[in-house]
Amino acid sequence: MCSSDLGRGACQQVVLTGAEAALSALPVLKCWPADGGRFVTLPMVNTVDPETGVRNVGMYRMQVFDDRTTGMHWHVHKTGARHYDAYKRLGRRMPVSVALGGDPVYTYAATAPMPDNMDEYLLAGFLSRRPVKLVKCVTNDIYVPADCDFVIEGYVDPAEEKAVEGPFGDHTGFYSLEDRYPLFHVTALTRRRDAVYPATVVGIPPQEDAWIARATERIFLSPIRMALQPEVRDLTMPEVGTAHNVAVVSIDRRYEGQAVKVAQSLWGAGQMMFNKYLLVVPSGTDVRDSDALARLLRRIDPVRDLVRSEGILDVLDHATATPGFGGKIAIDATTAGAALNPASQSESVPQLSLPEGCRTDLLEKWGAALAFAEPGAGVRTPEGVRYFVLFDPAAAELMPEELLWLAAANTDPRRDVRTEGATLVIDARSKRPGEGGNPARFPNVVTASEATVGLVDRRWTEYGLGAFVESPSRRYRRLLLSGGAQW
């Protein structure tokens, strides 16, 4: 699915080295007001394992520090970071080449949850049904697609001190805060004569990256069935879960504990290890039908049907006290549909004694009452509701899907999810940094500045965007805890 060419590719029609290889020639974006600078947001970062020679192509954001230097945002769980550690052990400088653009299938492949030691360009060739033609870079021995738009060649020196990178308005809808990451040094910049610079902006869902997650659902469902869990029938990662926080899987249930088996297997498989909340439903359930899911969730027993665990989470998860590690919950709803006789089950809302200011618009469908109180303030748990969810007062007017995004993002199941009688209590409020097992830092949500919103509003017709749409940033701005990237 790959072929190498000893000649030049279209991506090398223009070759700049030395002082001419300046990153200021690229229209790199600063996406959000509290970002630490400008970031390359769709890079295909090519590295090679120094011991096996196997290539990895990953997507790791790159903060531009100057014309010749960027950060390299390698999370500890990623293959690029493992390659970095291998070069460090060997005491060798690490060649890196960053491809931009070309066939969009390359960009997708760089994000795909491929098994370690498998070349992402094999997936790209398989999906496009033609080999990916690769050419050797000018200043290092890495091969990149011949038809991409730009290539930034360079190296990372593992002996060099890491640099402070961030903040960055991330796909979670929150800022990922400053941390230390390796430096990438540019040795050459090559491009097509007609090159188009690709970029994306991520933030509160749904954004463009939601479609990448949707493609991953469909492409990797069959491999999950064949290699991991043959009982899996369907899988979805809702947009509100920002790829990792929420997933729904339907299975053919034949025996007791099968949902637990599936949950534990998925939590140990590739990027599914980052999942935080997993709903397991019986086969025949449409995993994208909120009405069908709500019927099951109203009927679960929060004591019997909850599977609690802990394990690896995304480094970008801001709710955990230990970065990259926290609680997980699976809900076994595979028998919930048969738990009660539908003919005798009343779906009416019971008379409840709710705390003042509760929202009840989700009570009939989801069995959920919502309360709004300052972080840390005590709130009485009412009897007779299946779910009782606590939010900051600023979230009181959010839509249901926005509340689900916020609840999944702001909670560590070990600390924030408990049962009181037959009620599942979820504390989705902001966490005061450093208090009571809370994270040491807590980020702000990502919103556009009023200056940017006003500019877009004034030029809407000029942009040709169709019917006017009010910026959601104006509503989300109520959620801000401070004026910067963090509380």
Question: Language model features by range: what are they?
Answer:
Residues 13-99:
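Internal mixed beta-strand/loop scaffold within catalytic domains of large alpha/beta enzymes
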Residues 1-33, 103-487:
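Charged, compositionally biased interaction regions
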